Amino acid sequence: MSLSFASAPKTEQQPEYSQIVLDTFFPVINLNHMRQAMRIDNTITSVRLYEMALEAVIHVNRQLALTKQRALMAGQQTLVQTDSKLPEIRYRHAVYNYTKANLSEIYADYDATGKTASRFESKQQSADDYRREAHAAIADILGVHRVDAELI
């Protein structure tokens, strides 16, 4: 008797969808690394991940536009030059988490087992959690508090 196990398909991006470079000031986003770090399986196609990550990069870059402008005026050509390695790490964290939030929302009603109603709420909560993580990463880059609260 022999046992045979089906191997899972590879979760690598197609080469033309493996990186996002919109602006040389900000770090390159490696989508193969994102897949591994955020546990994005092969049910998300290369094109879909690329599109969702592109939206996240645009969103994060807009939030950091003033930071970029100030850095360029100070003679710094990249986000990494503004400080230690921390801004690059936080930038990646923001992009990865916004991407995962977008994917969680889009695929909230997708479930191969047919239990979509019970999983919808938990996936929506996950999307909110990913967004909160991304917001915290951007707040760290900007040097502002992560939470704004006012006593009424």
Question: Positions of the model-derived regions?
Answer:
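Conserved short "hinge" loops at termini or chain/domain junctions
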Residues: 1-80, 143-152
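Generic serine detector
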Residues: 2-7, 18, 46, 84, ...
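Short, glycine/alanine-rich amphipathic alpha-helical segment
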Residues: 79-88
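Short loop/turn elements at secondary-structure junctions
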Residues: 87-152
